[in-house]
Amino acid sequence: MQTFTLNNGVEIPALGFGVFQIPQGQTKQAVLEALNVGYRHIDTAQSYMNEAEVGEALAATKIPRDKIFLTTKIWLSNYGYEATAKSVEASLTKLQTDYLDLVLLHQPYGDVFGSFKALADLQKAGKIRAIGVSNFNSERLADIVAFQDAPVQVNQIEINPFYQREQDLMNAKARGHVLLEAWAPFAEGKDGIFSNKTLTLSLIHI
């Protein structure tokens, strides 16, 4: 699978399998099936309430851990330096792993600076390979980049063919080559994206 190189040299698969809104009790099997068809990036979050099931899938698969890129996100109730550090340890336990490939701050509210400092320190300690944010607009991204010593590797935001956010892309590149990662790149299947004639023709000619 194609990868992108983050600004700290870590390789991230271009395509990830997100586990948001998978019904309780079905996440383990969904992740195993995703891995079986070739996905190597699994994206979860503390607020999804399914980290433990993702961990069960990672424990059950025969694919080595170092071949799987694992993302989770810190929820608002765990913001602040100490709370974030403690929540990462809890996520590691649920996910049955001793390191995380990418950890993001899920929303741009609350004590983002204290939380990001905690992620940076955990990155230095080797428990996280890459750190970043999610749902930060250009102004909030500029704040976190300007007032933190550690570089931001990723900003995961909503991007799809109907909402391309070209200015955000340019701004992220200017802020230390932060990678913009799309959530819901297929617009959650809405707006006729899979039957759109222009998009269908584009796929035919790729």
Question: Model-flagged regions — what are they?
Answer:
Residues 21, 46-48, 74-76, 109, ...:
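Active-site-proximal loop/turn and secondary-structure-junction residues that shape catalytic pockets
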Residues 85-88, 113-118, 169-170, 192-200:
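Charged helix-capping and loop-helix junction motifs
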Residues 156-161, 177-192:
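His/Asp/Glu-enriched short active-site or ligand-binding loop at hydrolase and phosphoryl-transfer sites
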